[in-house]
Amino acid sequence: MSTSSHTVLLIQTSPRLDSRTWGDYESVTDALDALCKMFEDFLSKKSAAPVTYDVSQVYEFLDKLSDVSMMIFNRETGQYIGRTRAWIKQQVYEMMRGRCQHPEGGEKVIVGY
């Protein structure tokens, strides 16, 4: 499946049904970026200083969501394929590893607002 496939990100932030929301993206990468941006916005509300985080903190954030999934368009079948929280976490890890490798082996991101 191509990372440039149309992707719908589905999120439920709390047990309340009215906390459900979704986003429409041109690619899996765009949807993952939006999810990480949501996490960064969450962190920036806690601190005015630049924020450093690693993948384990993103995982914790994702685990606290009542539900998170993606529907990714498969051009070969003409259907959307559902992806779970576990799959999303693996994709976040791969994305962060590719963008932010450090000599110590950890993946860290610094965000300044």
Swiss-Prot record:
Cited InterPro entries: EHR_sf (IPR035912), ERH (IPR000781)
Quaternary structure (record): May form a homodimer. Component of the pid-1 variant of the PETISCO complex (also called the pid-3, erh-2, tofu-6, and ife-3 small RNA complex) containing at least pid-1, tofu-6, ife-3, pid-3, and erh-2, which is required for the biogenesis of a class of 21 nucleotide PIWI-interacting RNAs (piRNAs) that possess a uracil residue at the 5'-end (also called 21U-RNAs). Within the complex interacts with pid-1.
Family: Belongs to the E(R) family.
Phenotype upon loss of function: RNAi-mediated knockdown results in chromosome segregation and cell division defects in early embryos. RNAi-mediated knockdown results in defective activity of the PIWI-interacting RNA (piRNA) silencing pathway. RNAi-mediated knockdown disrupts the localization of tofu-6 to the perinuclear region of the germline. RNAi-mediated knockdown results in larger tofu-6- and pid-3-expressing foci. RNAi-mediated knockdown results in decreased expression of tost-1 in the germline and in embryos.
Origin superkingdom: Eukaryota
Sorted UniProt keywords: Cell cycle, Cell division, Chromosome partition, Cytoplasm, Nucleus, RNA-mediated gene silencing
Protein name: Enhancer of rudimentary homolog 2
Subcellular localization(s) per the UniProt record: Cytoplasm; Cytoplasm, Perinuclear region; Nucleus
Tissues showing expression: Expressed in the germline (at protein level).
